[in-house]
Amino acid sequence: MDLLVDELFADMNADGASPPPPRPAGGPKNTPAAPPLYATGRLSQAQLMPSPPMPVPPAALFNRLLDDLGFSAGPALCTMLDTWNEDLFSALPTNADLYRECKFLSTLPSDVVEWGDAYVPERTQIDIRAHGDVAFPTLPATRDGLGLYYEALSRFFHAELRAREESYRTVLANFCSALYRYLRASVRQLHRQAHMRGRDRDLGEMLRATIADRYYRETARLARVLFLHLYLFLTREILWAAYAEQMMRPDLFDCLCCDLESWRQLAGLFQPFMFVNGALTVRGVPIEARRLRELNHIREHLNLPLVRSAATEEPGAPLTTPPTLHGNQARASGYFMVLIRAKLDSYSSFTTSPSEAVMREHAYSRARTKNNYGSTIEGLLDLPDDDAPEEAGLAAPRLSFLPAGHTRRLSTAPPTDVSLGDELHLDGEDVAMAHADALDDFDLDMLGDGDSPGPGFTPHDSAPYGALDMADFEFEQMFTDALGIDEYGG
């Protein structure tokens, strides 16, 4: 064991590494070095990753990644994905071109060895909340601009995702470097022990065999939690900011009808419209209320805004219903790994010769010892033509509006953690709420504040989201804390 430790520190000295920064003083040992979880709606706050990890066992390396991300709930969320059949990820862009030059993802162990021996970990500060060059869109003044708003919000999401994924790619490379150096030190230790026992073995062959046996499996494990953090936190951040604006403009969505190209557009994590009160359909077929409740159950557990539709929801029914798991159908975890494998296989697919490409396309000719990042049943499914993933993505939803006089309003208020009425207690005293019941029968129309505002009335604040000052952000955070938006954490 001492020799193994010496080997690890010899590797660190050779690479010019410095010890990792200490954890915050005065706190428990497991205090994360990363900043707290994302504050809802704050699109400009940076999150800098600590220095690259040391070569440690894979389990410790995995825990270090969770600690650096502040993502302790990551493994539980990965397990939760295995209990749902919804395709939450196929509508997201793969951005596989970002990984075409990532040699550390090669399925040839010799490439990994060559890369690992030469790679110097990136020690500059890595901001995993980097931003793209597209501005956050604001809601239009009239409903006629909702189509352009949908496209603008989608472009903003894709730009933010690509900018942040470049940072996540660097983080993955640093952790793969630490993993490789640990495996290399372990193999050298075993090689010395074998030599002392009179059994000479080839060091290079031992290292390549170890990489084939452990490196790809552990890399896929790291990538799974890393990219789940990317997709989930970015989607939360953008959608809660958009939700806060859309909730204040019900006039834009009361008559909105949205016809989707595929159910995947509604089941996906990123859903630009969270209020569609006119009609919500997939190729002209209305969405069932039960299906919408099941989808919202998943979104609630992922701490994403619910999708609301007055035309679909049943009056008096709950907003969420636990979905039934069908063991013979694809699962969300499988769809997620299909997306991850598109990234991990990008380098090998891009550098593969034509003859190797034929072997990759035909399962009967694949080598049984071929290294890979695992497989899922979802990769073997024959999807129907109307739901098959396309490189160009799905078409934008077709928007229309109900005729005048057919306005629909939600019958159920958004769920919050704020309780009123007989559950309200002031300073420990019992307060009679009987007189407050009169408010239920109070007609607000007597105040002249009906659905049609008077002349000169501005229905919303036209200031762009990015123009808010820090005082606005602080008030917004107090408001979201009261609603329990960050309740689920991680």
Curated annotation (Swiss-Prot):
Which Pfam families does the record associate with it?
Alpha_TIF (PF02232), HSV_VP16_C (PF12149)
* Region Transcriptional activation, residue ranges: 411-490
**Presence of keyword Transcription:** yes
Q: Which InterPro entries match?
A: Alpha_TIF (IPR003174), Alpha_TIF_sf (IPR036538), HSV_VP16_C (IPR021051)
Q: Name one GO cellular component term.
A: host cell nucleus
Instruction: State the organism of origin.
Output: Human herpesvirus 1 (strain 17)
Gene Ontology biological-process annotations: biological process involved in interaction with host; DNA-templated viral transcription; positive regulation of DNA-templated transcription; positive regulation of transcription by RNA polymerase II; protein-containing complex assembly; regulation of viral transcription
Question: What is its biological role?
Answer: In the early stage of viral replication, acts as a transcriptional activator of immediate-early (IE) gene products (alpha-genes), which is released by invading virions. Recruits P-TEFb to the viral alpha-gene promoters and overcomes transcriptional inhibition by ICP22 to promote transcription of IE genes. VP16-induced complex represents a regulatory switch: when it is on, it promotes IE-gene expression and thus lytic infection, and when it is off, it limits IE-gene transcription favoring latent infection. May play a role in the aggregation of tegument proteins around nucleocapsids during virus morphogenesis.
Return the protein name: Tegument protein VP16
Residues that the record marks as modified (Phosphoserine) are S18, S353, S411, S452
Protein family (similarity comment): Belongs to the herpesviridae tegument protein VP16 protein family.
Q: Which domain of life is it from?
A: Viruses
